[in-house]
Amino acid sequence: MPSRSPSPSGSSADSSDPSADSSASRDAVVVALRAAGCVFAEDEADLILATARTPAERDAMVARRVEGLPLELVVGWAEFHGVRVTVEPGVFVPRRRTEFLVDQALAHAPHASVVVDLCCGSGAVGAALAASLGPVELHAADIDPVAVRCARRNLAAHGGHAHQGDLFDALPAGLRGRVGILAANVPYVPTGEVPLLPAEARDHEPLTALDGGGDGLDVLRRVAAGAPDWLAPGGILLVETGERQAPAAVEVFARAGLTPRLAVDDELFAHVVTGFAVR
């Protein structure tokens, strides 16, 4: 994307007509975003204009978007499964396809009372599950301190706790054998394919949230191996993965002693492997 664009404040509208000023400002924002390659320039312009509190803030938001910052990071929030989630630079932006993971969790464990969001990023999955399930004991964990800080804000309304550390090492020991839903949006992009990702992800999101190792399954293997010790009887592990990795992910779950099931949403291009505790 180009580093400069027409300023949204520059227009020849009659300043005595507020509606004309507003229309001219929107048009200028749309032009700037479209020139930068934003496919949904009109929708993005409306979101920026609704979020910005001052013309200066609006111009700064447009400039950041033109420079390639993801829209969600520009406005500071993302809509996820009906929940507005706070996001900030350096944090993985929740994807719409991951809503399918939440749907699968709710379908298979609608009465879960203990929920863990592993590799939580902003805590979007945990917040969405808590919003749908009602009062639950909610924990989230991530290795990235920036993500944990963001997750704490998003989980506060649900009484949730976010912990910093490496996977299960971050969780309170008292959760062992008690978790009804263990959701893990693990990184699953093979290392060699990270440079091929869109610039918005490659340049503005943490590598730890994207890079899944040589075949994209390094973190998934560790999560599957550790999950049985943490799941309650009848508890479930849910992990999002890519289409190519899905068959191997199912095998990993089975080798870990879980009963696996692959669910696919073709519209969202989402693949979720669910592992059911057998004990």
Residue ranges and their predicted role:
Residues 105, 129, 201, 223-227:
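Class I S-adenosylmethionine-dependent transferase superfamily signal
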Residues 3-24, 169:
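Intrinsically disordered, low-complexity terminal tails and inter-domain linkers enriched
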Residues 100-196, 244:
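Conserved SAM/SAH cofactor-binding pocket of Class I
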Residues 188-219:
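Mobile active-site "lid"/loop adjacent to the S-adenosyl-L-methionine
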Residues 48, 68, 98, 125, ...:
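Residue-level signal for inorganic ion chemistry
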Residues 140, 212, 238:
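Conserved SAM-binding loop
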Residues 2, 42-108:
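Conserved AdoMet
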Residues 215-276:
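Conserved Class I SAM-dependent methyltransferase catalytic core
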